[in-house]
């Protein structure tokens, strides 16, 4: 029995949809593997957040950390934070490297520079990568202290961190 044109069209549509879905899945898997390999190379390089237009369209480039300044804070024996920042336009980011119970991840946080004589408050939102591979949305606040040359960083889930720059 010969197939009708309508049945052939439906079959071709199903095949196309299945192929397209498989192609999208493979593309996402390859992107995740590439991103994971970049994340694994954090010991010799650091991510520079070039243009964070959106979560899906965030471009990175690798840069050596030798010329970047580092600020470290030890919360406890198993929680450690390191913040990196540079002087150029592409390096005006603070990079948050955390080790929580052996899990390692790097998150770019926009670095906000303040004039020393102004008491400006600013709120920014960043995405933290948790050990399970998901992205957790967090918010933090930057503001300069009136006394001395200090900038306070207050994450939403932690206490106050005061760094003397």
Swiss-Prot record:
Where is this protein found?
A: Membrane
- What is the membrane topology listed in the Swiss-Prot or TrEMBL record? Single-pass membrane protein
Q: Spell out where the chain crosses the membrane.
A: 10-27
Q: Which domain of life, per UniProt?
A: Eukaryota
Per UniProt, the keywords (alphabetical) are: Membrane, Transmembrane, Transmembrane helix
Any GO CC annotation of this UniProt entry = membrane
**Additional comment:** Partially overlaps DAN3.
List the protein's name.
Putative uncharacterized protein YBR300C
């Amino acid at each position: 029995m010969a197939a009708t044109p309508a049945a052939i069209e439906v079959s071709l549509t199903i095949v196309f949809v299945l192929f397209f879905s498989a192609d999208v899945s493979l593309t996402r898997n390859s992107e995740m593997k590439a991103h994971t390999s970049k994340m694994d190379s954090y010991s010799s390089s650091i991510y520079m957040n070039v243009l964070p237009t959106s979560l899906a369209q965030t471009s990175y480039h690798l840069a050596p950390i030798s010329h970047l300044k580092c600020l470290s804070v030890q919360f406890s024996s198993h929680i450690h934070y390191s913040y990196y920042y540079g002087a150029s336009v592409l390096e005006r980011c603070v990079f948050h490297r955390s080790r929580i119970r052996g899990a390692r991840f790097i998150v770019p946080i926009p670095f906000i520079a303040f004039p020393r004589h102004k008491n400006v408050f600013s709120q920014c939102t960043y995405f933290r990568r948790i050990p399970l591979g998901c992205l957790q949305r967090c918010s933090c606040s930057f503001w300069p202290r009136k006394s001395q040359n200090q900038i306070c960083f207050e994450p939403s889930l932690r206490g106050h961190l005061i760094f003397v720059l």
